[in-house]
Amino acid sequence: MPSISTNIILAFTAALTGMLVFRSHLMSSLLCLEGMMLSMFILSTLTIMNLHSTMSFMMPILLLVFAACEAAIGLALLVMMSNTYGLDLIQNLSLLQC
């Protein structure tokens, strides 16, 4: 496996670990999620370029579209939470609070 792919997989793993460790704040979770999406985009682009697969050239673009939608929804949720509660704690999102 080339070193570039290994580094990108390591970046994805680090972002996933960050998502699991820093899950109390929404901003940290969104940043880790963006890191995961970026590493998936780069890895899929490199894989398609190495395999010379012409049928799946649109897959990285589709992944970027989903990442942009996820970022927009996440930022809207973050602004709504900070205006309502003054915090970005994920526990404020629970509907089962007493």
From Swiss-Prot:
InterPro entries: NADH_UbQ_OxRdtase_chain4L/K, NUOK/Mnh_C1-like. Signal peptide: none annotated. GO terms for cellular component: mitochondrial inner membrane; respiratory chain complex I. It catalyses: a ubiquinone + NADH + 5 H(+)(in) = a ubiquinol + NAD(+) + 4 H(+)(out). The chain crosses the membrane at residues 2-22, 29-49, 61-81. It is an enzyme of class 7 (translocase). Keywords: Electron transport, Membrane, Mitochondrion, Mitochondrion inner membrane, NAD, Respiratory chain, Translocase, Transmembrane, Transmembrane helix, Transport, Ubiquinone. It is a multi-pass membrane protein. Its main location: mitochondrion. Its EC number is 7.1.1.2. It is found in: Mitochondrion inner membrane. GO terms for molecular function: NADH dehydrogenase (ubiquinone) activity. One of its GO terms (biological process) is ATP synthesis coupled electron transport. Changing M58I: In strain: Isolate NARA4.20. Changing S94N: In strain: Isolate NARA4.20. PANTHER family: NADH-UBIQUINONE OXIDOREDUCTASE CHAIN 4L, NADH-UBIQUINONE OXIDOREDUCTASE SUBUNIT ND4L. Core subunit of respiratory chain NADH dehydrogenase (Complex I) which is composed of 45 different subunits. Core subunit of the mitochondrial membrane respiratory chain NADH dehydrogenase (Complex I) which catalyzes electron transfer from NADH through the respiratory chain, using ubiquinone as an electron acceptor. Part of the enzyme membrane arm which is embedded in the lipid bilayer and involved in proton translocation. Belongs to the complex I subunit 4L family. This is NADH-ubiquinone oxidoreductase chain 4L. The gene is MT-ND4L.
